[in-house]
């Protein structure tokens, strides 16, 4: 029986039921719940099958809303990390975001230029500057990843 013909009171349940109906591998999508911004509402953190990036949703005014996309890691202190590495060029991007009330708010980034292989660093609202590789890794490693316990969408309590 299709999941989406049921009227769910939980906006996350409606989304998950839709995925389970639409995708033949819906059971391979995973989720966890965590209050990332301290507002008392659990954010829905999702990952597609074989996906490296997470999509995060929240509930505002009784509706599911996008909170953040392209998230690689959740870090201690309710920080989100976006990490992009291009092995063929040497380019790297590490962006760090604080979990704000409405959305993820940019804090700082560390990048590696694929042509010069120099490292750069910039805070929100400031111009970037060149830094040494050891400084780059010190900044990147200062954000500690949290191990998330992800569950199959089929385990979500549809209500």
Predicted features and spans:
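Beta-propeller blade repeat segments, especially FG-GAP/WD-type strand-to-loop junctions
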Residues: 53-67, 97-100
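Acidic/hydrophobic-patterned starts of short beta strands in beta-sheet-rich repeat architectures
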Residues: 37-47, 78-84
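Blade-edge motifs of beta-propeller repeat domains
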Residues: 1-26, 61-71
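Short, solvent-exposed loop/turn segments at conserved positions within beta-propeller repeat blades
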Residues: 49-52, 89-90
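Beta-propeller blade termini
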Residues: 27-36, 72-81
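Extracellular structured ligand-interaction cores
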Residues: 41, 54, 93-94
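Residue-level detector of high-confidence beta-strand sites
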Residues: 47, 66-69, 107-109
């Amino acid at each position: 029986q299709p999941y989406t013909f049921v009227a769910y009171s939980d906006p996350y349940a409606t989304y998950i039921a839709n995925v389970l109906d639409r995708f033949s591998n819906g059971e391979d999508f995973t989720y966890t719940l965590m209050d990332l911004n301290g507002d008392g509402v659990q954010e829905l953190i999702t990952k597609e099958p074989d996906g490296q990036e997470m999509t995060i949703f929240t509930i505002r005014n009784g509706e599911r809303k996008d909170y953040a996309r392209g998230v690689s890691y959740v870090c201690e202190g309710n920080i989100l990390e976006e990490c992009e590495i291009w092995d063929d060029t040497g380019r790297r991007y590490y962006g760090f975001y604080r979990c704000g009330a409405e959305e993820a708010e940019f804090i700082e980034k560390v990048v590696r230029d694929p042509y010069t292989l120099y490292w750069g660093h910039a805070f929100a609202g400031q111009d970037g500057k060149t830094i040494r590789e050891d400084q780059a890794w010190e900044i990147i490693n200062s954000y500690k990843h949290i191990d998330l316990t992800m569950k199959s969408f089929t385990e979500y309590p549809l209500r």
